[in-house]
Amino acid sequence: MSSNAQVRRRAVQAARGESPFDLLLVEAQIVDMATGEIRPADVGIVGEMIASVHPRGSRTDAHEVRSLAGGYLSPGLMDTHVHLESSHLPPERYAEIVLTQGTTAVFWDPHELANVLGVEGVRYAVDASRHLPLQVMVAAPSSVPSTPGLEMSGADFAGAEMETMLGWPEVRGVAEVMDMHGVLHGSERMQEIVQAGLNSGKLIEGHARGLSGADLQAYLAAGVTSDHELTSADDALEKLRAGLTIEIRGSHPYLLPDIVAALKTLPHLSSQITVCTDDVPPDMLLEKGGIIALLNLLIEHGLPAVDALRFATLNAAIRLQRHDLGLIAAGRRADLVVFDSLEKLVAREVYVGGERLAHAGRLLKPIAPAPGVTPPRDTLPIAPLRADDFVLRVQGIRHGVARLRHIRGARFTQWGEVEVQVRDGKVQLPAGFSLIWVKHRHGRHQATPQIALLEGWGELRGAIATSYSHDSHNLVVLGRDADDMALAANQLIASGGGMALAQQGEILAHVAMPIAGMLSDLPAAELARQFRELRDLSSQVADWEPPYRVFKAIEGTCLACNAGPHLTDLGLTDGGSRQIVDPLIACRETPEPTDHNNNPQGA
C-alpha cells in the first residue's frame, strides 16, 4: 500500500536536494489540514510519494514542473462509507466518475453484493477494484442478512465468514453493524462477528439509528466505533459525546443545516467528524457529485471550507487507519486535488499517486475493467410469473369480510388495520391501497411469493418492480394492477434484474442491471439518462413527490431491521419485536353477493 523502500529512499534524497523531484507543483496555496492555514508553498513529488513541501520558488530541480497558478491544493477527498452498488455501476465506471470530482479513496461496504452472492460477492468487490487508481478499501459485510429469521438473502455470515474476509489484506474492517438488536441482546452470531473484527485489529463500523442513552452506551461497549445513521443535530452531538466517529452523510441533506449549526456551537471540532455518501444513484452521482456535493452543501450551510475539507481528508484518514493519506506532507501519498475557489468546490485537477489523472472534470485516460475478473450474472433464477401470482387471498373464507394488518407509510412505516371485502377468496382492494409483493430470488428455498396491503403511496397506477431492495435484494413489486405487476416483474426476470415501470399493459421505463441484479454494464452517461427517465416517469405511477423519495422508499421498503412493519420473502415482519406476523386478524363468511362485477385484484 505504501511506497516501496526504493521510492522512499529517492524521496529522502530529493527532499535534501541531492536529486531532482519527478514532479514539482509550484504556485500552490496549500490547504493545511493540520493547522487550518492556507499558505503558499511548492510540493515536490517522487513516484507516488510527496517528498517535500517547501517555500515557493526555493526549488526548481525536477523532471517536470507544473504551475497550479494559485489554485488551492488539498489532499484527495475520502468517502468513509459507501455502498458503491447504489450507483448501479461496476467499480471501474464508478471510479471514472468520482476521481474527476476529487475523491481519491473510498471505504466500500459491499453488503448488497454479499447479500446476493455471499463471500464470492465480497471477493468480486476486492478483485474488481484492486487495480483501480481510486483507493478502494473494502469492508467485510456484517449484515448478511440484515435481520436473520425475518428474511433470507443469498448467504448467512457469522464469525467464520468474517474471519475469512478479514484475513484478506484488502479488507480493512467490519462493515456497518446493522443488527443493533442482536448486539444489544447478546446474540451468538453478532458476538462472533464483532469479536472477529476486534481480533483482527481492524475498524468496526456502526449503524446506530435511533440508539440513545443506555442502549447507545451498550452498543459502543460491544466494540462499535462509528455511526452514519444520524437522525438530528441532537443525535449527532450525543453520539460525538459518547465517543463515536460520526459520518455526516449526503443522502439525508435535510439534516445538514441543523447539524452544521450544532457543530458551530462546539468549542472544538473533533477529528471524529467525517463525511460519507452512503448511497448515491447514478444520475445524481454524475450530475451533482458524491462527496464533493456534500462538502458544498456543508459550506453553503455555513461550515468553513477548511473544516469541511478536513472532515473528508485528515479526519477520514485517521478514521480509516490510512496514515499515508489525509495531509499534504512529506512521506504521504501524493493523492491531491486542486480547487480554484473554496467558496464552491470544483475539482480543476486531480492527482493520484503523483500522476495527473483528471483535468476540468474529465478523466485523462479511461480505466479498464480488472483483467480476468468476470462480473457475476444470472442471479434471478425465477420462472416467468402470471397475473394470478399477484392476487392477495384470504384463506378460510370464500365470500365475506376480513380484517387485515397492513403497512402504512413508505420509508418510515407503521402498522395499520383495515377491513376488506373478500370475493372468491380474493381481497378487493380498498380505495387508497395498493399491494407490495416479494419473492425470494436466491434459490435457497422455494418460498411462495409474499403479498401484503400497502397504504400511503396513493393508488398506484400500474406497477413498480425492482431487484435492488435493501438488504436481501429479493424481487419486489408494488402496484394495484396484477397484469402490470406481472409485466414489470417478468421484464426484470428476462433482463437479469434492475428496475421497471409498467402501466396499462406497457413497460413505461426499464433499467437493466444484469450484474448481480444490481449493476449495469451501460456507460455511465447512458445509465444516468435511463435512471433519470425511470425516476421521472415514476410520478405517473406513484402519487407522491419528489420522485427521488419514491425510489429511496422502494429500495428500503423491505428493510426488516428498521422499526415498524416490512414485507420480506418470509412474510410480514415487525422490526421491533423481531417476529413474523400473520396479516389476518379475523374474518367471517357472508352470503355470496349477486353482483360479480367487482375486480378482485383491484386491477
From Swiss-Prot:
Class in the EC hierarchy, top level:
hydrolase
Q: Name one Pfam family in it.
A: Amidohydro_1
**Cofactors demanded by this protein:** Mn(2+)
Q: Which superkingdom is the protein from?
A: Bacteria
Which HAMAP family does the UniProt entry name for this protein? Adenine_deamin
Provide the reaction this enzyme catalyses: adenine + H2O + H(+) = hypoxanthine + NH4(+)
Transport recorded as keyword = no
Q: Its gene? A: ade
The record describes its quaternary structure and partners as: Homodimer.
Annotated GO MF terms: adenine deaminase activity
Biological process per Gene Ontology, one example term:
adenine catabolic process
Report the EC number(s), separated by commas if there are several. 3.5.4.2
The UniProt entry, under Gene3D superfamilies, shows: Metal-dependent hydrolases, Urease, subunit C, domain 1
Q: What's this protein's family per the entry?
A: Belongs to the metallo-dependent hydrolases superfamily. Adenine deaminase family.
Which keywords appear in this protein's UniProt record, sorted alphabetically?
Answer: Hydrolase, Manganese
> What is the name listed in the Swiss-Prot or TrEMBL entry for this protein?
Adenine deaminase
